[in-house]
Amino acid sequence: YCVAHACIHHSSKPHNAILEMYRVSKKGILIIEATDSLISKLACRFNLSEEFEVSAVKKNKTYGGVDNSSIPNYVFRWTEREIYKLFSSYKPEIIHNIKYDYGHHLKFTKSLFIKFFFKLFFHIFKKQQNLLSIFVDKNSSNLTLRKW
């Protein structure tokens, strides 16, 4: 397996990074990255989250940005549809076995009330959470080829 947690968005070519993980793995890949949800977009709009990860470069002074440089990276946020299109373009002959799950990490508040509110909200609107886990099974016994 190949696993990446909150690091692909530091690449200047995040799509290529995922495809390279898939290429070198034998059994599959697991990725946990930011999701492109309405709530994430609103958080960026109201400066509760970053569109470009300036904080990482400020913290480290000379690195932590795109390709670990001093240039803040764009925080690429993913959707299920984008992952589907990526793998369908890369290996169109395969019906890919992709599983998704959602989670959240709220950095902007320590308020228990706000955290409780979001817990309820995310229970109802699961896909609005700010984290997306993606598992792509590459096990040959689970692969199905398209019937053209």
Predicted features by range, described:
Residues 3:
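A conserved beta-strand element that flanks and buttresses the S-adenosyl-L-methionine
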Residues 6-11:
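A short His-aromatic
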Residues 15-31:
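A short glycine-rich, Lys/Arg-flanked "PGG" loop and its adjoining helix->strand segment in the class I
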Residues 27-60:
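Conserved class I S-adenosyl-L-methionine
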Residues 71-101:
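Short alpha-helix
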